[in-house]
């Protein structure tokens, strides 16, 4: 069931995208977080529910390419907004994906690249830090910002905070 649903979603251009403002303590919108949902025929399913299956089926690279390809045109629609998208570490550590990401980002104006925030889960950062460092340096050099979310959810070393150029930490509410 899951595999069919995910493959259909990918063949139709990806998940449904929604945006949620991330607001500072001062009440200012820092960025808009793009959230993904898929429709299973009855209801919408959040990415928290289906992403483990995307990873299990080895479809994260295709999924992340679709999301980034869909994010870029949104930068033109919202010229004043910073847009954040969750990207899997599994995609980012693959050289083929890194080349695609570099080439795709190079086609954007620098002013647009500065408004992209790639979000990574802290557990993935802790697990893949040495393999993530080069691609984080690459995207930072291109002007793209990096955020780490779910910080504090799992027990991982915090040494990555000094090792990676992360602009934003999003704490897990727990």
PLM segments and residue spans:
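Cyclic nucleotide signaling catalytic output domains
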Residues: 1, 5, 49, 53, ...
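Short acidic-capped amphipathic helix/loop micro-motif used as an active-site/signal-coupling element
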Residues: 40-44, 68-72, 150
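Active-site core of bacterial EAL-family cyclic-dinucleotide phosphodiesterase domains
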Residues: 2-53, 86
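The catalytic core of metal-dependent phosphodiesterases that act on cyclic dinucleotides
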Residues: 106-174
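A cross-family glycoside hydrolase active-site/sugar-binding cleft signature
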Residues: 18-20, 35-37, 84-88, 119-121, ...
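Catalytic core of bacterial c-di-GMP phosphodiesterases, primarily the EAL and HD-GYP domains
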Residues: 29-33, 59-131
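Hydrophobic pocket-lining residues within nucleotide cofactor-binding pockets
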Residues: 22-25, 38, 90-92, 97, ...
């Amino acid at each position: 069931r899951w595999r069919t649903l995910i493959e259909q979603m990918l063949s139709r251009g990806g998940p449904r995208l929604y945006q949620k403002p991330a607001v500072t303590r001062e009440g200012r919108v820092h960025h808009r977080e793009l959230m993904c949902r898929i429709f299973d025929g009855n209801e919408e399913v959040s990415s928290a529910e289906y992403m483990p299956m995307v990873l299990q089926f080895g479809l994260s690279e295709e999924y992340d390419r679709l999301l980034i390809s869909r994010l870029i045109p949104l930068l033109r629609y919202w010229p004043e907004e910073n847009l954040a998208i969750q990207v899997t570490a599994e995609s980012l550590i693959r050289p083929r994906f890194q080349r695609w990401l570099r080439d795709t980002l190079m086609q954007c104006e620098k002013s647009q690249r500065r408004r992209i925030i790639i979000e990574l889960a802290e557990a993935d950062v802790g697990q893949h830090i040495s393999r993530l460092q080069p691609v984080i340096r690459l995207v930072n050099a291109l002007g793209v910002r990096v955020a780490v979310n779910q910080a504090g959810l799992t027990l991982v070393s915090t040494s990555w905070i000094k090792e990676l150029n992360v602009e934003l930490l999003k704490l897990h509410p727990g």
